[in-house]
């Protein structure tokens, strides 16, 4: 799978673009705050209909514009696809081969993308919200059902929280309605949690292999799901998860009314990374944290290939300078020249020529993008 052409207008500070990409490696060179990250964000948004930087889609519409339009041509083994997504102040709409999609869950998955940014270095020791977002972004693009239940859960959770606030302010008193909302939240939550366990089982295997290959150590990396309802286990089916959630909701009913917010569910769950059984959040060095983060990204590539039969595209946003030669070499070994890769950097010397011997290079300045005629080694393309 690769993205051969990309067009955009009205997205952040980027000038209108119509770019052709190399099927292998594309490098975007420029100083900070010139638009490199915005470009990768735009490509990522075209793929999964969400930003890795903000949950407010309106922020991505350029000042003075009514909408942003992203479009691209995707080449797969069996077919070519034209994708388009438009962000407006009313929402977003998506098309596949000029056919508008009834739901975004029908659109997502036609172009799979893995993005690795400096913020991902915080996955191990950062806030739990970063790890939950990691799961939702990555698992959502490989399974429309996950995306559907995640969207449904967010809507139901907001409704339940709003009603809990009304009860706390004595603006409502219908406990039957609260029971209905609790049942609906537990149903969506159980489906989401069950799928998280399933995907993490495969991700675990690939991440452990990647960690050993990168570090050269015998340390075992494990990724564990930590549900906010401690009674839930990986062996539970959705019906069992739902019942355990309902039991816990009954136990904490008074506390939720007092706090006026939902205390359990996927929005409170977390991931734990362990090295040889020790919590990496507490014990991992900075180098180990970087290796864990890179291992997760490489594991995602393997997982998507396993589930879809296609390599995703890989977006590396200013992270090459964060990786030493060994980690860059490990990255090369895993992508095997089969994964289309987009790299942003302020300095070409930070990128190993063993990884990108003859990339297509673009300069970015003030949102304008032009192609450079020479590769890393100075030879004309």
Curated annotation (Swiss-Prot):
It is found in: Cytoplasm. GO terms for molecular function: ATP binding; single-stranded DNA binding. Keywords: ATP-binding, Cytoplasm, DNA damage, DNA repair, DNA replication, DNA-binding, Nucleotide-binding, SOS response. GO terms for cellular component: cytoplasm. It comes from the Bacteria. Its main location: cytoplasm. ATP binds at residues 30-37. GO terms for biological process: DNA replication; DNA synthesis involved in DNA repair; double-strand break repair; SOS response. It holds the Pfam family SMC_N. The RecF protein is involved in DNA metabolism; it is required for DNA replication and normal SOS inducibility. RecF binds preferentially to single-stranded, linear DNA. It also seems to bind ATP. Belongs to the RecF family. This is DNA replication and repair protein RecF. It comes from Lactobacillus delbrueckii subsp. bulgaricus (strain ATCC 11842 / DSM 20081 / BCRC 10696 / JCM 1002 / NBRC 13953 / NCIMB 11778 / NCTC 12712 / WDCM 00102 / Lb 14).
């Amino acid at each position: 799978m690769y993205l051969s052409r990309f067009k955009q207008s009205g997205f952040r500070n980027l000038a209108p673009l119509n770019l052709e990409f190399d099927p292998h490696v594309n490098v975007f060179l420029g100083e900070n705050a010139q638009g490199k990250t915005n470009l990768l964000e735009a490509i990522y948004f075209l793929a999964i209909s969400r930003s890795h930087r903000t949950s407010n889609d309106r922020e991505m519409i350029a000042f003075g514009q009514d909408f942003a339009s992203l479009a691209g041509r995707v080449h797969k083994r069996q077919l070519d696809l034209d994708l388009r997504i438009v962000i407006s102040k009313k929402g977003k709409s998506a098309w596949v081969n000029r056919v508008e999609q009834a739901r975004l869950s029908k659109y997502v998955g036609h172009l799979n993308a893995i993005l690795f940014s400096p913020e991902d270095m915080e996955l191990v020791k950062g806030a739990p919200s970063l790890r939950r977002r990691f799961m939702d972004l990555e698992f959502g693009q490989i399974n429309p059902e996950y995306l559907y239940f995640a969207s449904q859960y967010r809507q139901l959770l907001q409704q339940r929280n709003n009603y809990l606030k009304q009860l706390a302010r004595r603006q409502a008193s219908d406990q039957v309605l609260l029971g209905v909302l609790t049942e609906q939240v537990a149903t969506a939550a159980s489906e989401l949690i069950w799928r998280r366990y399933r995907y993490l089982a495969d991700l675990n295997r690939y991440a452990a292999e990647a960690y050993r290959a990168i570090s050269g150590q015998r340390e075992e990396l494990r990724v564990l799901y930590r549900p906010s309802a401690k009674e839930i286990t990986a062996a539970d089916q959705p019906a069992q998860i739902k019942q355990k959630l309902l039991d816990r909701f009954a136990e904490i009913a008074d506390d939720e009314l007092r706090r006026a917010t939902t205390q359990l569910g996927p929005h409170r769950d977390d991931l734990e990374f362990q090295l040889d059984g020790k919590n990496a959040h507490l014990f991992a060095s900075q180098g180990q944290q970087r290796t864990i983060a890179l291992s997760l990204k490489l594991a995602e590539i393997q997982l998507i290939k396993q589930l879809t039969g296609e390599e995703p595209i890989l977006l590396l946003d200013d992270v090459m300078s964060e990786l030493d030669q060994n980690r860059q070499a490990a990255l090369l070994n895993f992508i095997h020249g089969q994964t289309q890769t987009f790299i942003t950097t302020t300095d070409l010397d930070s990128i190993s020529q063993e990884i990108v011997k003859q990339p297509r290079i673009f300069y970015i300045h003030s949102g304008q993008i032009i192609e450079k005629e020479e590769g890393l080694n100075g030879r004309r393309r």
